[in-house]
């Protein structure tokens, strides 16, 4: 490296720092940020506050079930209200503990109980390992640490449907009945879900206990999303860096996806990041469209990355057919290549009927298009095409050790046999 090149690199960060600043505080646009005011959620704030106010009178509040689609403000509103409750409770010398658990990550009965116990470890000196103890022993410790003094403990289970679908409702049964086993403390549960249907998985006794009170969050419309983005933008960006059409466009695009405020915030943040990296003086509508494309690509890559192994092998069979010029293909043609790939990996193949189900799942995820077409007297068949480029799929699979061995495989030209 020459001296001039080294000097250029040394000055790199200084040069980037001196570029036109777009963001004043980017964190304001993150999902984890709790603003001082929540536009268009005052009705839900009031409802939650009415249910929780008994705490300030020394009474046990009802359990609450909160539901609504993704990006409707459920989590941020619950955090906002419980933080306000904690502030006011301190004024009245009423001990309140709020324990927030994301059940997409903490998704087993054992881990939920362990997280609650470990919330109090600084106070109690008791810590439960994330694996290894009998569950009933962890539950006994939970009761012990909670009941060490008089207090109200509010347990927020976010994405509660993920927990129930994976591990059943036993933990909910325990937590919604724990007050009968406590002498000093009182526990209330707030369950948050994107999926109302998950209640079908619950034992009727658990459902009646959890759903003592319900608060519904409807989707935002485009105008409401504009208000939310305008409020956040004032804190997030320097004055004058957003072109006039940027916020309305972000709001309109997010409103198309069931009024998802998270999507709207992501669009605005990523558009700002793209403008900043380009050294642009303003964030424009073009930056928003590019942000939309990037977010969709990132989401699709994440979907492909988290597919089960059999679905990945099936998808790679479709990739090979595409690269061989054999798409659209029917289910039988795809299945033939899929079986060969399974043999190559020493993997037990699924039945053609099950593969037909997986093709439908890939279609629903938007990774492929599986259109049923009529062949006249030959009946109906599926025509399968890719919606994602083979390059992008291969790029995701490059980092997947289970599927990596297939990346050197191709089909013989004009034949559907592996090379």
From Swiss-Prot:
Pfam families, sorted: AAA_22, Cdc6_C, Cdc6_lid
Keywords from the UniProt entry: ATP-binding, DNA replication, DNA-binding, Nucleotide-binding
Disulfide bonds: none
Superkingdom of the source species: Archaea
InterPro entries cross-referenced by the UniProt entry: AAA+_ATPase, AAA_22, Cdc6_C, Cdc6_lid, ORC1/CDC6, Orc1/Cdc6_arc, P-loop_NTPase, WH-like_DNA-bd_sf
Molecular function, one GO term: DNA binding
Binding site for ATP: 72-76, 220, 232
SMART domains, per database record: AAA, Cdc6_C
An example Gene Ontology biological process: DNA replication
UniProt entry tagged with the keyword Transmembrane: no
Family statement drawn from the similarity comment of this UniProt entry: Belongs to the CDC6/cdc18 family.
Role of this protein: Involved in regulation of DNA replication. Binds specifically to the oriC region.
Protein's recorded name: ORC1-type DNA replication protein
Taxonomic path: Archaea, Methanobacteriati, Methanobacteriota, Thermococci, Thermococcales
Gene from which the chain derives: cdc6
């Amino acid at each position: 490296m020459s001296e001039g090149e080294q000097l250029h690199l040394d000055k790199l960060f200084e040069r980037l720092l001196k570029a036109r600043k777009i963001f004043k505080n980017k964190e304001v646009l993150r999902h984890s940020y709790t603003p001082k005011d929540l536009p268009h959620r005052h009705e839900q704030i009031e409802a939650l506050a009415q249910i929780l106010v008994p705490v300030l009178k020394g009474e046990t509040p009802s359990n609450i079930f909160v539901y609504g689609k993704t990006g409707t403000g459920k989590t941020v509103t619950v955090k906002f209200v419980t933080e306000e409750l904690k502030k006011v409770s301190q004024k009245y010398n009423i001990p309140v503990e709020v324990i927030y658990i994301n059940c997409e990550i903490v998704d087993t009965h054992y881990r939920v109980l362990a997280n609650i116990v470990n919330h109090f470890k600084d106070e109690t000196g008791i810590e439960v390992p994330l694996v290894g103890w009998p569950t009933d022993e962890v539950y006994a410790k939970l009761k012990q640490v909670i009941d060490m003094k008089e207090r109200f403990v509010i347990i927020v289970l976010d994405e509660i449907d993920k927990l129930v679908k994976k591990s059943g409702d036993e933990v909910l049964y325990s937590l919604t009945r724990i007050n009968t086993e406590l002498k000093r403390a009182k526990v209330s549960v707030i369950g948050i879900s994107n999926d109302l249907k998950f209640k079908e998985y619950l034992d009727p006794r658990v459902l009646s206990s959890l759903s003592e009170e319900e608060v519904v969050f409807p989707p935002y419309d485009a105008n409401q999303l504009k208000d939310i983005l305008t409020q956040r933008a004032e804190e997030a960006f320097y004055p004058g860096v957003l072109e006039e059409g940027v916020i309305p466009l972000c709001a309109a695009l997010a409103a198309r996806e069931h009024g998802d405020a998270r999507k709207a915030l992501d669009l605005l943040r990523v558009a700002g990041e793209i403008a900043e990296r380009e050294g642009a003086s303003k964030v424009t509508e073009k930056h928003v469209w590019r942000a939309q494309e990037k977010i969709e690509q990132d989401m699709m890559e994440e979907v492909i990355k988290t597919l089960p192994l059999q679905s990945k092998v099936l998808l790679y069979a479709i990739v090979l057919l595409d690269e061989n010029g054999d798409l659209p293909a029917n289910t039988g043609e795809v299945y033939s290549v899929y079986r060969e790939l399974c043999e190559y990996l020493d993997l037990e193949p699924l039945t053609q009927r099950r593969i037909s189900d997986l093709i439908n799942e890939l279609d629903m995820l938007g990774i492929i298009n599986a259109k049923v077409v009529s062949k006249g007297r030959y009946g109906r068949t599926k025509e399968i095409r890719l919606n994602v480029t083979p390059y992008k799929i291969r790029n995701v699979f490059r980092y997947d050790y289970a599927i990596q061995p297939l990346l050197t495989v191709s089909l013989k030209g004009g034949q559907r046999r592996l090379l």
